[in-house]
Structures are given as structure tokens and as C-alpha cells.
Amino acid sequence: MLGLMMDKPLLISSLLDYAAAYHGGTEIVSRTVEGPIHRYTYSDAELRAKKLAKALQALGVGEGDRVATLAWNGYRHYELYYGVSGMGAICHMVNPRLFAGQIAYIMNHAEDTLVFVDLTFVKVLEEIASEVGSVKGFVIMTDEAHM
């Protein structure tokens, strides 16, 4: 690729790499589903997204696999976006405002293999868990105190 405009591929994960390298100390602020404000830096986010990618690989998620998220925007969802796509899988963000039956249909159609869910939507997943055959597991995004 030498002599071209870019000397490396433009990947979604490279956006977070750039932010960590040039704005590593800049704070990212979000409110958690549990209520408190969460603060950390781009460097922290990059590290956690890379750890998430390794954990997904350990769970058997590979390139091209679909990983669904049923979550509000927050730091955990942010890390998923970069961690999942950074390891070559597809981050499938499911609209949490849909009805349970629609969510089940969408997850089946996409053939999602793993679902990350905010506490807010656990009841929805309990309702449809038996209907989403391709899903091998569910990960509830919360801290230990709220399990």
C-alpha cells in the first residue's frame, strides 16, 4: 500500500486507537443504567475494548459472527462497539424500543451468537430466550452489586 494515501487499513478499531494515542487523558463521561455517573479516559476505553475482544475470542466468537447488543448508550455499549468490531465480529445493535417478538425475529434473522444486555432489558430476553435458537449465551452488563 506504499505510495497510496494511507499505509494501513482504515478499521473502526483504529478510531479508538487514535483517540487513545492522541487524546488518551481525555475523559469520557456517561450515566450507567444503575444510576451513577461513570468517568474514564480514552486510554481506559481502549484497554477495556481490547480485553473484551480477547474475552469474546475465548468464548468462541470469531470473525464474521454476529454479537447482539440490547442496551442503552453508555460506556459498556461503547466498549462493545469497538471490542466486537475490532476482533472482526459484527456488532449488531438491536433497537430496544421494539416489541419482544420483533426483537426475537431480528436476532434470529441475523443469526446472532451472543447477546449483551443491559439490566433494563433482562425481562425482555427472559421472554424470548427460548425463541432465539442461534444465540449460545447472554451477557448481562452490570456490576457485581446489581446482579
Q: Predicted regions span which residues?
A:
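A short N-terminal helical cap/helix-turn-helix that marks the beginning
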Residues: 7-29, 47
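Secondary-structure junction/capping motif
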Residues: 10-14, 41, 147
